Every structure is written in C-alpha cells, then in structure tokens.
Amino acid sequence: MKVSNLKITNVKTILTAPGGIDLAVVKIETNEPGLYGLGCATFTQRIFAVKSAIDEYMAPFLVGKDPTRIEDIWQSGVVSGYWRNGPIMNNALSGVDMALWDIKGKLAGMPVYDLLGGKCRDGIPLYCHTDGGDEVEVEDNIRARMEEGYQYVRCQMGMYGGAGTDDLKLIATQLARAKNIQPKRSPRSKTPGIYFDPDAYAKSVPRLFDHLRNKLGFGIEFIHDVHERVTPVTAINLAKTLEQYQLFYLEDPVAPENIDWLKMLRQQSSTPISMGELFVNVNEWKPLIDNRLIDYIRCHVSTIGGITPARKLAVYSELNGVRTAWHGPGDISPVGVCANMHLDLSSPNFGIQEYTPMNDALRDVFPGCPEIDHGYAYLNDKPGLGIDIDEAKAAKYPCEGGIPSWTMARTPDGTASRP
C-alpha cells in the first residue's frame, strides 16, 4: 500500500473485559480509509488512569503526525511530559507504539515480525501455569498439560506458595498438606488482605520440586516464580537449594529495590535467573546484563513503552548472551500477546514465552488470536500485528476498575507485603 501525506486523524481507547480482566486497547486511525492500527495499553490495576493519559494527553499529541515516524514519535512521546518512565504513561505510549507498528506493517504488506528481520523459528515454545494446593495437585495439573503437548510449565503451590485467600484456616490446611509446613499465626483484629507466610513458602518450594522430579523426571522444564516475596537472603538460599532440580529458571527472586543482592545470589548459585517483571525502563536491565547477573529478561512489554524499546532490549541482551522471556499474564490483551510473539519470532535469543489460555469470548472480541497447538504458538501471516478488535462485541464486556484483591498482600503479623 502506497499512501502520500499520511496523517493520524484520531486516537481512541477501547476498554473491555471479555476474559474477566480489564484490558485497554489503543486504536489509531489515519486519513487513509480503513487504515488503522491497534496496540495494547493494559495496566489493569490503573486502567482508567491509562485511558485518561491516552485520551487527554497522547491523542492531542498525535493527531496530525505522520504515523510512519515510529522512532521519532516514541522518543518525543517519552519526553513530552518531562518526567518519564512511569507505568501509566509508558502503557499509554505502548498502546500508541504497537498501533504504529501495526500500521507500518499494513502499509508494507508485511507482518511485523518481517519488519523486525523475519522469522528465526517456525513456532513459539510456550510455558503455561500449573498451580495447585499441594504437590500432588500440581503434579496432576502438569500431567494434564504434558498431554496437551506442553514441554515447559510454571509450578506454584497456591498463590506463590500460599493459598491466595484471606482465610487463614484454608491457608493452614493447604500448607499442612505440603508436608506439614505450618504458617505462623496472626494477631487479633486481623486487617483484611491476602495473607502469606514467606518463611513457610520458602520451605515448601524445594519439597514441591523434589516431589515433581521424583514423579515426572527431568524430561519436562520447570519454572518457578518467587514474585519478589521473600527476603534477599531467603532468595539466595532458595536458589542454592533448587540447583539439584535443574529449573529452567527462577523468576524475580528479589524485588527491584534489592537488585544489588543478585551479585551475591549469582556467586552462590547456578540456578538460572529471570528478572524484571516490574521494571519500567529498559536501562534497569543494563547493569544486570552487563554484569552477567541474569539469564533471561523478564519484561512486560507495555510497561516499558512497547515494541520500539523491547526490540532494542532484545538486541542488547543477545549481544551479552541473555535470552528473552516476555511477560504473558492474563492481564495483557490479545493485541499485546501478538506483539510479544512478533518479537519472539524475530529474536535469535528467544528463550521462552509465557502464555495464558484465552477463553472463547476473548477470541470472539479479538479475531486473529494466535493458534496454540501442542505447546507452540503460531501467528497468522497477515500484515501488521495480524489481529483486530470487534468494538461492538468489546462493548458488551465493560471494565469494572478497582484494586485487585491479590495485590492486598500481608505477612502473618499483618504487615503490608509485596503481592
């Protein structure tokens, strides 16, 4: 498609929740009839703030600009608010950035992965979640996924080792099933929240993987997510203990505020490390990559600003022997899923892709979702990102907003904790 004097004419935010999770999609329209792009701007925990950022700030900034000038729009968009690299504006910018890549692909008549250099592989290996209340339930769920063809699984007991509930009796019951590990008691007048005992969790994880390796062997790859919920010293001890179980990687063992501890962890353990789900700036990975402190970049693409910074991060990682592991939870839209996978296909240092199964409503609202077959994802070869949105159907699933209960985490004595 060849178009002269192409301009952005409209920018809008589409909020929808067909999977039960609030999603934000940016649609950029142009003066060429029928030519538009879609991008993911989902920050579920602050969905209406992102919508406001797009509608009130990004839209006026974009209208009248040439949509093919992706790099210039990204760079000027980042600095346009002076203060930069916050998750709300980054997600807003991500929605714009992905939509511009979608438009560029449609203009070129090529999938985005071809614009990024072309395919490096034929399919995208996926890992899925296999949670359970105890070792046997996790094992059963893994066996079910193996029958579906998955070769990589993330293994968790309850909510990152706890029960994902504020019912202390249920937590105690579930942890008791995990080889009689008892969580600490809470004081009187318990503050509402999701209670989690990091010490009981840290004791239960090695027993989980001992059970799984004894029952399932070493023919399946295991991932575990610490979710930054333990002290740095506990994380180091956990990584050391888990070496014998040969994890594919241990995710986010420390909080972003404690990344200096990764040097000590690296000195004491050979367990592969994935880090960065909560990072909001590509430069946060630089010292970890430069000092060989991680094996995988664990990156939420929309929170760093979209495809433009993500492809640079992937290349920098490649030059230093670090592989990609883009974040793929349920709280990114199918548009964001496709953006991840275009990066996956075109990155020689691809490591693995997290995948959360989509229900029928999601696939109905977003035609063009990836095909999933025997643990692999396959994108179509349509120009751009290859995915669309049915706005009328999307409107049938309004967003609710609010604070997700799982983020209201507390330790047994009632102290607020990282979720």
Curated annotation (Swiss-Prot):
It holds the Pfam family MR_MLE_N. One of its GO terms (biological process) is amino acid catabolic process. Its EC number is 4.2.1.-, 4.2.1.39. Its cofactor is Mg(2+). Binds 1 Mg(2+) ion per subunit. InterPro entries: DgoD-like (IPR034593), Enolase-like_C_sf (IPR036849), Enolase-like_N (IPR029017), Enolase_C-like (IPR029065), Mandel_Rmase/mucon_lact_enz_CS (IPR018110), Mandelate_racemase_C (IPR013342), Mandelate_racemase_N_dom (IPR013341). Substrate binds at residues 45, 129, 277, 298, 327, 331, 354. It is an enzyme of class 4 (lyase). GO terms for molecular function: gluconate dehydratase activity; magnesium ion binding. Keywords: Lyase, Magnesium, Metal-binding. The active site is at 160 (proton donor/acceptor), 227 (proton donor/acceptor). Mg(2+) binds at residues 225, 251, 277. It catalyses: D-gluconate = 2-dehydro-3-deoxy-D-gluconate + H2O. PROSITE patterns: MR_MLE_1 (PS00908), MR_MLE_2 (PS00909). It comes from the Bacteria. The record marks 329 as: Important for activity and substrate specificity. Has low D-gluconate dehydratase activity (in vitro), suggesting that it has no significant role in D-gluconate degradation in vivo. Has no detectable activity with a panel of 70 other acid sugars (in vitro). Belongs to the mandelate racemase/muconate lactonizing enzyme family. GalD subfamily. Homotetramer. This is D-galactonate dehydratase family member SEN1436. It comes from Salmonella enteritidis PT4 (strain P125109).
